[in-house]
C-alpha cells in the first residue's frame, strides 16, 4: 500500500515528512552503532534500512536493490543486474579506503556521488546517499554532529 503524490499531494507530503523523521532517527541509531563498531557497521543492510525508512508508504520496493531499469534525467544508471556487484564493490572501497584516506569529507563525498551514480534503488536514492554521507562524516568526526532536526521545517 502506498500513496502517490498525484493522487493526494497533502497526504503524500505528510507521509514523506514522517518518513524523513523516521529515517533521521534510524540514521542516529546507525551512527551510534558505527561509533562503537567502526567502519564495518557501514554495509548494504544498513543502506537497505535507510532506504526503506525513506520511502515507506510512498514507493514500492523500498529497502531492496532495483530489479528494473530506471532513467534519471540524462544519466542512465548501470543495468539493474549489475547493481548488487557494484554495491559490493562500493562497500569494499569505503572499507579499504577508510584508513588510507583520513580527510573528513573525501570518502563521504565519494559515497554521495557513487550511490547516486549507481542509483541502486527505485526511489529514495538521494535521501539514502545523503544519509550515508552524513553517517560517514559523523564516524570520521567520532560523534553525531551537533544541531537540531531541521527536516520538517525545510520541506514545508
Indicate residue ranges for each PLM-predicted region:
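FIC/Doc superfamily catalytic core
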Residues: 1-156
Amino acid at each position: 500500500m502506498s500513496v502517490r503524490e498525484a493522487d493526494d499531494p497533502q497526504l503524500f507530503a505528510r507521509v514523506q515528512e514522517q518518513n524523513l523523521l523516521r529515517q533521521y532517527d534510524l540514521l542516529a541509531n546507525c551512527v551510534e552503532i558505527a561509533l562503537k563498531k567502526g567502519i564495518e557497521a557501514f554495509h548494504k543492510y544498513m543502506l537497505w534500512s535507510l532506504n526503506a525508512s525513506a520511502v515507506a508508504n510512498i514507493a514500492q520496493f523500498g529497502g531492496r536493490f532495483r530489479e528494473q531499469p530506471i532513467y534519471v534525467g540524462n544519466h542512465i544508471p548501470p543495468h539493474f543486474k549489475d547493481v548488487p556487484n557494484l554495491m559490493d564493490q562500493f562497500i569494499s572501497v569505503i572499507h579499504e579506503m577508510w584508513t588510507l584516506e583520513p580527510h573528513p569529507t573525501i570518502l563521504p563525498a565519494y559515497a554521495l556521488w557513487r550511490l547516486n551514480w549507481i542509483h541502486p534503488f527505485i526511489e529514495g536514492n538521494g535521501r539514502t546517499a545523503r544519509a550515508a554521507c552524513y553517517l560517514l562524516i559523523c564516524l570520521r568526526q567520532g560523534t553525531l554532529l551537533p544541531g537540531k532536526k531541521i527536516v520538517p521545517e525545510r520541506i514545508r
